[in-house]
């Protein structure tokens, strides 16, 4: 079995950085538009269960800032990220090169306490988490299920796995 293909400049790197910054800033709209359709559906379902509303009423959350529900829907995801990565350290993670696992599936490794942009030596290379993306609608979007599966496969903790009802 072949390992993932390494890509040095890939849209998932910028997407991961933007998503982490949005989570740190509490920008629910930016977080929402960065998520895959499947992940959005999962969060809408969780929102429906928590709010006691029908799935039909919870579906179709818009991320453009006009939908008041987006902050409530993304709150469990943001809480999970802050708990796993640390609110005070969230802006300090480095994002490694993308790894292409399959057509339309890629992930990036997060390096804690990275500091300034630089090339990392073998001794410094200690990834703590990964974020997985799927390519849909011509964009690379963060995917909850792929992040969980690839994190488990890599023996890394799932930064999005702390979501609870």
Listing of model-derived features with the role each one plays in the protein:
Residues 1-33, 37-49:
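Short, low-complexity N-terminal intrinsically disordered segments enriched in polar/charged residues
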Residues 1-5, 31, 63, 133, ...:
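Polar low-complexity intrinsically disordered regions
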Residues 2-8, 43-122:
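Surface-exposed, charged secondary-structure patches
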Residues 12-14, 24, 93, 103, ...:
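Short, surface-exposed loop/turn motifs at beta-strand boundaries within globular domains
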Residues 24, 39, 47-50, 59, ...:
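Generic low-complexity, intrinsically disordered sequence content enriched
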Residues 99-165:
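Low-complexity, intrinsically disordered terminal/linker segments enriched in charged
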């Amino acid at each position: 079995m072949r390992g993932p293909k390494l890509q040095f400049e890939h849209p998932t790197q910028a997407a991961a950085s933007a998503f982490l910054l949005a989570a740190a800033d509490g920008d629910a709209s930016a977080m929402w538009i960065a998520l895959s359709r499947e992940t959005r559906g999962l969060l809408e379902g969780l929102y429906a269960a928590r709010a006691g509303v029908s799935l039909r009423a919870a579906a179709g959350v818009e991320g453009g800032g006009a939908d008041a529900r987006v902050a409530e829907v993304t709150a469990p995801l943001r809480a999970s990220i802050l708990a796993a990565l640390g609110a005070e350290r969230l802006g300090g993670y480095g994002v490694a090169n993308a790894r292409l696992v399959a057509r339309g599936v890629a992930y990036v490794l997060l390096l804690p306490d990275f500091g300034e942009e630089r090339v990392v030596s073998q001794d410094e290379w200690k990834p703590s988490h990964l974020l997985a993306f799927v390519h849909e609608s011509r964009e690379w979007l963060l995917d909850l299920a792929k992040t969980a599966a690839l994190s488990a496969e890599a023996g890394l903790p799932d930064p999005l796995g702390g979501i609870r009802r």
